[in-house]
From Swiss-Prot:
Keyword set, alphabetical order: Coiled coil, Cytoplasm, Cytoskeleton, Golgi apparatus
Region ranges (Necessary for localization to the centrosome): 246-286
Broad class of where this protein is predominantly found: cytoplasm
Low complexity: compositionally biased ranges: 60-73, 153-167
Protein name: RAB6-interacting golgin
Species per Swiss-Prot/TrEMBL record: Drosophila melanogaster (Fruit fly)
Gene field: Gorab
Protein family per UniProt: Belongs to the GORAB family.
Amino acid sequence: MTEKFNGFSHDEILKITGVKEGGVGKRPASLEAAKPALRIQPGIRRMPDKIFRQADQLRKQQQQQPQQPIQKPDVAKKTKSGTATPTEKPPTPTPAAEDDVANGSLNLDRPLSDSLIEALYHGNATARDKKTPATYADAETTSTDDSSILKISGGDSQTTSSTDDGSILPSTQDTSPRERLNTDSPFKGISLKDFEQHRRMIEEQNKQKKQMLYQAIEQHTQKTAAESRKIEEIRHELSKLESDLAVDVALLRKQIDNACIHFANVEKQYVKIEAQFLRAKIELHNASEKKELLTEHLCTVIAHNEDRKAQKLTELMQKVGLSPTDDCQPIDLTQQSP
């Protein structure tokens, strides 16, 4: 499609509704006479039943809420004309209502978006008509025909109810000249067939986008699960390494403790043996000195004994009258000894 759907032209709407050019606010002469002419019009379809069910649920919810007292006829006339007294103030939208409207416009499960409803029914929706996505049927003041794909904008000024809900006729209530149909729609100039094709294409694109989103979410979920498994495996390996390291460290610490104990015992033995060695060495040195002293003393005793013996023999020879010869003189060992 090269062109956007700009809505139905004014001539097509007048041809379908049966309203003449000069009489916008006038009703057809006969409702029954207009039905056969409108039934043969091609391309007009009933709105989905889902929207009707939503409208019925909305009516029930509004009826269950605490209803305000019934307005008097003069107040109803003021409501029709769209004017209000200076003392009356229009209701101000609350933040909760604005949040509900914003959340409703983002709902992907809805059959029609707000912009599409505005294009089909009212063109650019005014602030008076922007209440909820299905507030085109007001249970308190209006009861309009919701079975037509076309809807002449009447807002709150439509007070007469339609007796034929299954008819394809649009709403035939009286409208003021200033509330004429707004045909400035973005889908103006495109037939219903092209609009249906465009709608189906948009729905197919939305389905493809949803499928792509679901696939992306599934891939992200699978990727996250795989990363979680990898992280869990890494944690398991790290815990295993830490446990093996703890076992090895405990074993080595035990061996080191045993080696320390053995080293202490050997060191004690070494110190003891070293002390014994020093003691034995000292004893050996003392014994050697004592041996030398005793040997020297023995030699001295022997030498002195020989000297005394020689002197005694000399004295005895002199008493006898023998003279000792030179050869028999005693040898002084003390002089020869170094």
